A protein has these predicted regions:
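Structural recognition of the beta-strand scaffold that forms the well-ordered cores
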Residues: 25-26, 49, 77-78, 135-137, ...
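A short glycine-rich, aromatic-capped structural motif
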Residues: 15-67, 72-93, 145, 203-204
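Surface-exposed recognition segments
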Residues: 150-151, 155-156, 184-185, 202-285
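Surface-exposed intrinsically disordered loops and tails
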Residues: 105-123, 127, 183-188, 218-235
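Short, well-ordered junction/capping motifs at the entry into regular secondary structure
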Residues: 120-129, 168-203, 266
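Conserved "repeat-terminator" motif of extracellular CCP/Sushi domains
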Residues: 2-8, 90
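Short, well-ordered surface patches within globular domains
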Residues: 32, 71-170, 209
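Residues that flank catalytic or metal-binding motifs in active/ligand-binding sites
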Residues: 23, 28, 42-44, 72, ...
Length: 285
């Protein structure tokens, strides 16, 4: 649950020294080579929620609970990519932040990005460094914080297979420890070991939607167009275009829960599969 608090972090620039939101963890930016990139990418400072979005806070914001596996502290699931964007905007408005997404034409499958100073740009041109509200992470950002970021680099643990460990059972709910049993379901967040940044459930429990749009080439392989920090295909006006998901879920095997595994799903269709899909919010600071 998000509650307004004041917490200071050392090493942050003057004028940007306070965090107003409980359970939002400061993640220092840096440079690294993502698993899918041929070169280093830069990540700027962000705040990341400790947990996937829970049903409790979703219900408070959206006034409904679509989840198949009910429980206040379980991740919300059965949520589409577009619904996750809507949640981010409503949460931003609740706390007086400028929403990131222009969703007035979302029913047509059209998305625009709202940068600061009332600048509205197409998704492939967006610079999230110039946004204020809550949003989905890019895949570059997701791999950075799931791997432990700069802290893990300094500790020599950045290359863990899973988020926080090479032992999946320490950090993840997945097929072997929950998914293969008759009562298989999501689990309450925060019950497994956190990663180096204090983030929970990046591996397993629910897949996490990322911002990035995915297209396939003629061979059925992922087709990405490089654009600064983002890996964004420019077919942003297609509502059913595939979007990136990361981290695996309660119903997946260990390979799917690895940090560097790349999953995807359609933005609005195949609703029956959405019980595997949740999301985690981030915010530029």
């Amino acid at each position: 649950e998000l509650k307004v608090i004041i917490k200071k972090y050392s090493g942050r620039k003057a004028g940007n020294t306070e965090s107003k939101f409980q359970n939002m963890v400061f993640v220092q930016g840096g440079k690294y080579q993502p698993s899918f990139a041929d070169e280093e990418k830069e990540v700027f400072n962000i705040e990341v929620c400790k947990y996937p979005t829970t049903q409790k806070i979703w219900l408070e914001v959206m006034e409904n609970n679509p989840s198949g596996f009910k429980g206040d502290n379980r991740p919300v699931e059965t949520v589409s990519w577009w619904e996750a964007l809507d949640y981010c905007n409503r949460l931003s408005e609740k706390y007086g932040l400028e929403p990131v997404y222009e969703l007035s034409k979302s029913s047509e499958g059209t998305l625009m990005i709202k940068e600061l100073r009332e600048k509205i740009v197409s998704p492939d041109k967006a610079n999230f460094k110039n946004t204020e509200g809550f949003r989905l992470p890019t895949e570059v950002e997701w791999e950075w914080f799931a791997s432990g970021g700069q802290k893990a680099i300094e500790q020599g643990t950045f290359n863990y297979i899973y988020s926080g460990s090479n032992n999946i059972d320490e950090v993840a709910w997945y097929y072997e420890n929950i998914g293969k049993f008759d009562d298989a379901s999501t689990q309450e967040v925060g019950l497994k070991k956190s990663n180096q940044l204090g983030l929970y459930d990046c591996s397993g429990n629910v897949w996490e939607w990322c911002y990035d749009t995915i297209e396939f080439d003629e061979n059925g392989d992922y087709k990405n167009i490089k654009n600064g920090n983002l890996y964004m295909y420019e077919a942003f006006d297609l509502s059913n275009t595939y979007r990136r998901v990361k981290g695996g879920s309660w119903g997946n095997g260990n390979k799917d829960c690895a940090i560097f595994h790349r999953g995807c799903n359609q933005a609005i269709n195949v609703k029956e599969y959405f019980r595997y899909f949740g999301f985690r919010i981030v915010r530029t600071i």
